Amino acid sequence: MSISAVVFDRDGVLTSFDWTRAEEDVRRITGLPLEEIERRWGGWLNGLTIDDAFVETQPISEFLSSLARELELGSKARDELVRLDYMAFAQGYPDARPALEEARRRGLKVGVLTNNSLLVSARSLLQCAALHDLVDVVLSSQMIGAAKPDPRAYQAIAEALGVSTTSCLFFDDIADWVEGARCAGMRAYLVDRSGQTRDGVVRDLSSLGAILDGAGP
């Protein structure tokens, strides 16, 4: 079947995140490691309704304010936590926007499927990385209620794009999630930015055009 849509993982494929800087700032303000903040963020998201999570009507400031109360932070630390700009830790890879533009130029739907929604909404980080205008649908595992490599995650993004899984081309930097996409019927590639191109593996997204032409890895 011909390709009708291209689906990308977000972190590690389209965007990178400076975890060291984020860890330093979060620990400095809260005294907690980033992993603990992530755990609490996941619990807070689970308390939202599906509609709230999907349209992202609950701003992150609500979570941070709630966290500050739980930790009994002083007013200065609370204000600093709420004002902390997590978007400043994120950026798009140089090959990301050209790949999205190539998909759009060919008339393909573009989706993003992420298991991560750490301290930022699924779409907001793409907006910070100047990629959001080229993406049709963004879904996170919290929105779906299933995470990669669960087949339901891949089915959800395909349905949201209005296509079948078998007409999707998929890119991820986690091997198990790539295999999950293949099991769901997608044509999938592992993005290994530190390794060498080999069968089913690409170094970055610059090979998207060649793959769509049938000449890629």
UniProtKB/Swiss-Prot annotation:
Enzyme class label: hydrolase
Pfam family, one: Hydrolase
Recorded GO MF terms: hydrolase activity
EC code: 3.1.-.-
The organism's place on the tree of life at top rank: Bacteria
Gene3D superfamilies, per the entry: HAD superfamily/HAD-like
Keywords assigned by UniProt, alphabetized: Hydrolase
InterPro entries on file: HAD-like_sf, HAD-SF_hydro_IA, HAD_sf, S-2-haloacid_dehalogenase
Active-site annotation: D9 (nucleophile)
Function description: Able to hydrolyze geranyl diphosphate (GPP), farnesyl diphosphate (FPP) and geranylgeranyl diphosphate (GGPP) to respectively yield geraniol, farnesol and geranylgeraniol.
NCBIfam families, alphabetized: HAD-SF-IA-v1 (TIGR01549), HAD-SF-IA-v3 (TIGR01509)
Family according to the record: Belongs to the HAD-like hydrolase superfamily.
Protein name listed in UniProt: Phosphatase MT3486
Species of origin: Mycobacterium tuberculosis (strain CDC 1551 / Oshkosh)
